[in-house]
Amino acid sequence: DNDVIVDTFKLDVYDYDGLEPLINIKDDKVHVVNFWATWCAPCVKELPYFEYINETFKDKGVDVLLVSLDFPKNYDSKLRPFIRKYDIKSKVIAFDDTDQNRWIPAIHKDWSGAIPATIIYQGDKRQFYERSFTKEELEIEILRFLR
């Protein structure tokens, strides 16, 4: 029996105009925004660390947002099954905006566009990282914001 199980959970897709408010929330929380894709091995390797942060620090006012740069044609074949397989609990959104010359520098002036990339911010304090994290490194960065 080869019935295909269709992933029915809602996957919100944003362009930059839709994403921009989500990466500039003005409240007391520490916001962690990670840009990743299922085809990016270093991204996949560090996803459990973001899940750990989400699980461990959500009660301390830390909010994790995973922004997938997977191609739209792969949402059903790769992204949704990946989220289901690894039981991702953090909020995942898909980002689809072909105007890279606009949104890459808008997200951060020093960003080359390479992933993984992460923004951690709280109010006006903002850090941008174009690199991978170990679990320990990511936790240290979060704790710096929570001080």
Regions of interest found by a model, annotated:
Residues 82-115, 123:
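Short, internal strand/loop/helix patches
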Residues 10-31, 54:
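A short beta-strand-turn-helix
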